[in-house]
Structures are given as structure tokens and as C-alpha cells.
Amino acid sequence: MEKKKILIIPLCAVLIALVAAVSVMLKRNSISKHSLIYADVNDNKLISYKISEKAEIRISFDGYSEYLLVGKYIGGEYCCVSKGENSLYDVLLIKNGNIEKTYQLSFCPDEIAATDDGIYCLTNGKIYRLSTADNTETLYKDNVYTHKYRLNMLITDKGDLVYLREENDGSVSLVLDCDGQETDVFTFNPDDTIDVGLNTDNRFLYKDKSGNYKTMAVSVYGGKQQKYGKSATFVQASSDGKLAVKCKRQVLGECSDVYIVDGKTGIAVSTHLVDLDIPYSVVVV
């Protein structure tokens, strides 16, 4: 009887390890089915980088040749800003690989994000809201902090706006805007804090200089600050809220590879892209 117990214990350990390995493999395969969408800043082309194939594919839509910027689109796959044949700036909402709707802007923003109700455009410290009902532009926020930050305006998977507000005393507040109702998430000294984006689970990630640049996380919908536990150069949640993009510096060659990461399990798949190859405005689909 004792011999049987001795044999069963190692067998159970092997089975547990096998199940864990299979689970990780399945998650990696699931992550690999996704693609990165971004605009090539060198020739203004729209690029889809397929993780499974480690290859770039150019995307084009009839009537458009220059693609300047991409952003998150709640309700579809992504949005992008393009210069049309009439030399105006068009916002294309992409769903299922096709243009769902088109809107016109009088300027090219620095950052863009879209919902079914409105399109948010950040430029020169101001956020403009483009109505999806009548295509009108209105000034929405005029005190946005942008200095030394890569991501200053974000959209949660619920379609709510998150942005950085500059305060009179020089501090900066992370603000959640739900249909015009603002809630201050937390306030920080911009000289000591570097933001890295909005992760899955609607957690805002940032690096604190006073804490040896450890990555911290705080939920924009309430909750205490906590250590994120993993290094990140920037983070952008995917349109389905399941995956995130992050950069991770490798020891060999001092090269920053871009990883697709499951935000809930930490499983990562390398894209073999370096972070300098893609801009901060990248969307996972």
C-alpha cells in the first residue's frame, strides 16, 4: 500500500505540471492570433503586424493613401486618421476589417480614441470631442497635461475617458470622466512619476521615481494603489479588454522587444519587433 502511495504522488505532480504546460501553450496560441495595428511614421502606411507569422502586412482602404495615427475604438477594432483625396483629415472607424463610418476633422490630433457616441482628439493640451451624430467639433477639455508623457488620453473598455489634468499648484491629477462627471483617481508630482498607460482590468500603470521606478497600478474605477510587479515601458489595452502591449528590455543587445501580454495571467509572446519600430499609438486586434 505504501509503495502505491509513493507512486501516486509523483504521478499527480507530473499530471499537474502537464496540465499547467498545456494551459500556458493554449494561452500563448490564443495570444498569437492577435495583431498589432499602427501607422508607420516613416511613410504614413497603415500596418498590421500578425503575431503568429511575425510579419507585417500593409492595410489600405479605397480613397485613402496616407495614414497618420491609430487609436482605440470601443465598439469596433480600431480608429485611424487619414488624409483623404480632398486634403481634409478623415477619421475612419474600422470594424471587422472594413470602414464602418467616416468623420471629418479640421486638424490632425496627437492622440485619438473613439466610442460609438463620440471621438476624442487630443492636440496642444486640449481635448476636442467629435460628435458621431452630426460630425461637430467641440472643445471638451482645455487643461490636459502632456509634457514628457507618451499617453495622455485613454479610453476604458466601458467607453469612459481617462486623462491627465494639470493643476494650479503644478501637480497632475489622473481623472476619470464618465459622461461629463469627473472623478479624481489620484494626484502626483509629474517630476517623480512616469505614466505607462491603461492596462486590462482598467488599471492605470505608472512608474514612481521615489520607489526606484517600480511599476505601480491603480484602478481608475476605485481601489488602492498596488505594485504591478512587472516592468513596462508602455501599455495599451486591446479592444476586447483581454490583452495588452508592453515593451520589455532584454539583456542581450540591450534591445527592447515588444511583447503581447495577457493582462490577467502574465503570459507573454514576443513579436520580434523593437519598441522603436512602432509608435506609442498601437492597437491590439
What name fits each language-model region?
Residues 64-75, 106-116, 146-157, 190-200, ...:
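Repeated scaffold domains used in trafficking and secretory/extracellular systems
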Residues 42-48, 86-92, 125-129, 169-175, ...:
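Structural motif
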Residues 1-15:
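N-terminal Sec-pathway targeting helices
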Residues 93-96, 100, 114-118, 129-131, ...:
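Flexible "stalk/tail and boundary" regions
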Residues 22-62:
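An edge-strand/N-cap motif at the start of beta-rich repeat modules
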Residues 55-61, 98-104, 136-143, 181-188, ...:
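A short beta-strand motif characteristic of beta-propeller blades
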Residues 32-41, 74-84, 117-123, 159-165, ...:
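Short beta-strand elements that form the blades of beta-propeller/WD-repeat-like
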Residues 206-261, 266, 272-273, 277:
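Intrinsically disordered, low-complexity segments enriched in Gly and acidic/Ser/Thr residues
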